[in-house]
Amino acid sequence: GGNKEITDALSLYNRNGNIGFNDYGDEIDGPWDGPRTPSTTSFYVNDKYESDDLVINAGIRVDQFNLDDWKMKNTANPGWDETGQTILPDEFSDSDKKTVIQPRLGMAFPVSDRTVFHLQYGKYAQMPELDLPYASSRYMHLVWGGQNYTPDPMGFDLDPIETTQYEIGLSYQFSAAAAFDFTAFAKNTIGQIVISKNEDTDPACVSNGTCTQYYGADEDALYYENGDFSTINGFEFAFRTRRINRLQTYASYTWTDARGVNSDANSGAGNLTQEALAAPPAMIMPLYYENKHRGSIAMDYRFGDGDGGLLLSNLGVNLQYKFNSGHPFTLSDGGMGQRSSDSGALLDDARAREPQEPIGQSTTPWNHFINLKVDKKLSIGDYGVTVFAYVENLLNTKNVINVYSRSGNAYNDGFLTDPALSSEIVAAQGDLYVDLYENVNLANRQHYTLDFGQDLYSTPRTYKFGASINF
C-alpha cells in the first residue's frame, strides 16, 4: 500500500493553498477544501431632479456580500487539531453575509453663463481580495502549526472594504471652442485588510474561563483582519477643445497625496515578529502606490465621413503622451537571511530588512510614454467595421517602475558590490558565478520577478491590431 502513503506524505509536505483542486489538478469537493462560491447581490435606485438650472442626482445602492468562507466561534482559541492537522468542525460556522448601504448624491448648477459648479458624494464597498480569506486546511497547518514564519496567512469572516468619496469643482468655458474643468477630491477608505497577531491566543484561556479547552493553534500565529485605513486627497485639471480643422486636443493633470498606515495587507509583517514591537506602530506615511503627479496630452486628427476622398474618409490618428512621477519606497539594508546564493540578498523578508531612512521618503524615477493609434471606419453592407492599429510605448522607452530597495536603482541590487554580503560566495564559486549572476539576475531580473511577481521596468513597445463590428 505504498502509493497512497507516498501521496499522502507528499500532500502534507506540500501544504499548499489549493481550493477546489488537489495537488494533481483533479477537482475535489468537501466542506473545507472544496470550491468556494462567493457572490454579491446588489440593488440600486436613482432619481434625477431638475429645477431651472439646478440638477440633482440622488441614489442609493445596497450590496450584500457573501464570501462563502468560515467563521471562528472563538478567535482567541482557533479550532485547530495540530496532531491530526485538521480543522475541528464544531469550532467553525459559515461566515456571515454582510450588507452595506451606500448613498450617492450629485449636484450641478451654473454660477454664470460660462461657469458650472458641481459636487458629488458617494459611499462604495467591495469584497476583500479573495486570496486573503481562502486557504486550504493544509495551508492552515503551515500557518497555525508554528514551525515556519508565514507572512501570508488567511482571514476569517472578513468585512467589506468601504470608501467614502467627496468631489467638488467647476467647469469653465472660456471660448466657443475650449473649456477646462477643475475638481478637488478626497477619498477615505476603512476596513482595509491588515496582518495581525491574536495576542489572546494563549493556553491561559483554560484557567481564566474564556475557553473550556485549548486547541493546537500556535499562539504566535498570524492572521488577516479588517483594521486598516487610507486617505487620498488631490485635485485634477482637464482641458479640452472642440474639433477644429479635423484636430481635437485634450490635456489633464492630477496631483494626489495618498497616506495611510500600510500600503498593503502584509506591510506590517516584520513588526509582528519582533516581541518588542508586538503591535505595529500606527504611523501615517506615504503609501507605496502613490504617484504624486500624473498627466496626459492627446491629439486626435480625424477625417469625417466623405472627407479627404475614399482613402482618407473616416480615418483617424490619435497621438498620446502620458507621464507620471514615481512612487515612494524606502532605502533599506540587511543581511541575506535564509536566501540562497543564486538569488542574492533581495530584501523581501521583512525580518531581515532595516530601513535606512523614514518610511516612504525616496521616490522611483518619473515615467514617460508615447502611444499611437490609427483607425479607419468602413461600411460593409449593413455593417460598420472599424479596423485599428495601436502601438503602446511607441519609442520603446525603458521606464523604471520599481527599484531595488538596497541600492535605490533598477540595475544594481547591491549584492555583488557589497563585500560583506558576497565576498565569501564569490571566492568559493569564482568568476563563472559572477557572470551568471550579472546576466540572469541583474540583466534579466530573474530573482526580482520570482520574488515579487513584477518587473523593474515598464512594458516594452507593444503592437496591437484589431477590428470591431457594429450591427
Regions found by a protein language model. Give the residues of each.
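Transmembrane beta-barrel strands of outer-membrane/channel proteins
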Residues: 1-4, 58-64, 119-123, 132, ...
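Signature of Gram-negative outer-membrane beta-barrel scaffolds
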Residues: 1-114, 128, 132-135, 146-148, ...
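Residues that define the transmembrane beta-barrel architecture of outer-membrane proteins
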Residues: 37-41, 97-101, 162-166, 231-233, ...
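Residues on the lipid-exposed face of transmembrane beta-strands in outer-membrane beta-barrel proteins
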Residues: 43-49, 105-109, 168-172, 237-241, ...
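Outer-membrane beta-barrel channels and translocator barrels
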Residues: 51-54, 110-114, 163, 175-177, ...
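Membrane-embedded beta-barrel scaffold of Gram-negative outer-membrane proteins
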Residues: 116-118, 122, 128, 132, ...
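Gram-negative outer-membrane beta-barrel transporters
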Residues: 185-188, 205-328
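C-terminal beta-signal and adjacent terminal beta-strands/loops
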Residues: 308-350, 364-369, 376-471
